[in-house]
Each structure stands twice: as C-alpha cells, then as structure tokens.
C-alpha cells in the first residue's frame, strides 16, 4: 500500500477530464437509510469521492430557440455524458485508488429499471440495488448544495452538472461542507420557471 492523499485523487481526476472532485468521509452519511448508505455497498468504506462533469451551457441553446433538442439529450442530461464521458475517467480514478492499495467501487447513479426484491440475499444485509442519493453525496463532499427545488448546484457550473461517485476504503481528508444558502437564496426563480 502506498501513500495516497486527497490531493493526489483530485489531481488525477481532473487530469482525466473530470471538472470537479470532492471527498466526503463516511461519517457524513450517518443517519442515511440503510439502502442508501455507502457502507451497504462497501462495509469498510472510509471515504466517498464524488465527481462532476459539466453540462455545456450551449446544450440549452436549441431548446431556448425552440429548434433543437438532441444536443441536451445526448450530451447533457443523460446519453453520452452519463454513459460514456463520465464512466471512463471514473473507472480510471478507481483504478488509480486501487493501484495505491485501497479497494474502490465506482458508483453509477442510474435508477433501476424495476424495483429490486426487498429481501436481503444474505443475513444481516440490506436488499439488493442500494441506491445512493447522488445529490446528497455531492453535498456531503463539499461540491455544492441543493437548492429550493432540490436541484444540486455548484459554484462554478450552477445546476449544469452530472455526478458520479467512488466508494473506497482509502481514508482521505474530506472537503469542507458548503454553507447552506451559499448558492440558493430562495429567490424562487426555479418555481417560476416550472409554472
């Protein structure tokens, strides 16, 4: 096992094209429901590394003009961003952590197609398909905060990000939490935009 610091993890992630990398210690998930807790996936987890890639501002241009939607669909909300652009550097970062002697589980925040069975597959475990709340993980890793409409926001990209995570046994220094109200002043623009 070789020395691995939070700065090493962040540097490697950003070199691979991730826009933001934040770290939460496992204690920040205390009180999470068992089927949403990172330790249900990795019982000896010590840290959760949350990563973000931006959704380009230009992805909204065709929608705003009322002329072109596919850019947002493929390069923004899901499509290539979630299923191609994010997993590759996420996997590289998990390999980097494991190359330093710490087990790492890359976490894809997709929603299961159907509800899994409630019964655990082994005694003392939770049922299958544990589903982390990725926006809460992003908040716990200091990357941003949830606004009034429960949309995750960052200082650099606002709400235009997609999040993924790595659960690891590496004990990494956590990032400071963002003070609630730093980004969302409850102006209700999100509510007005949806009505």
Language model features: what each stretch is:
Residues 32, 39, 75-195:
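Catalytic cores of enzyme domains
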Residues 1-91:
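Non-catalytic, usually N-terminal nucleic-acid engagement modules in DNA/RNA processing proteins
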């Amino acid at each position: 096992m070789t020395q691995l610091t939070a700065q090493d993890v962040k540097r490697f992630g950003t070199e691979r094209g991730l826009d933001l990398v934040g770290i939460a210690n496992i204690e920040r998930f205390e009180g999470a429901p068992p089927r949403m807790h990172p330790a249900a996936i990795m019982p000896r987890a010590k840290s959760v590394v949350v990563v973000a890639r931006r959704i380009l501002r230009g992805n909204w241009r065709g929608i705003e003009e009322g002329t072109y939607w596919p850019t947002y669909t493929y390069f923004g909300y899901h499509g290539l961003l979630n299923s191609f652009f994010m997993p590759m550097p996420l996997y590289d970062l998990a390999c980097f952590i494991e190359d330093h002697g710490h087990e790492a589980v890359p976490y894809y925040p997709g929603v299961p197609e159907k509800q899994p069975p409630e019964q655990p597959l082994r005694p003392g475990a939770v049922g299958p398909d544990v589903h982390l709340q990725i926006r809460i993980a992003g908040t716990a890793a200091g990357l941003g905060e949830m606004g009034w409409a429960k949309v995750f926001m960052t200082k650099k990209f606002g709400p235009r990000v997609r999040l993924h995570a790595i659960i690891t046994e590496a004990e990494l220094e956590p990032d400071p939490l963002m003070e609630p109200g730093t980004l969302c002043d409850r102006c209700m623009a999100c509510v007005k935009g949806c009505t």
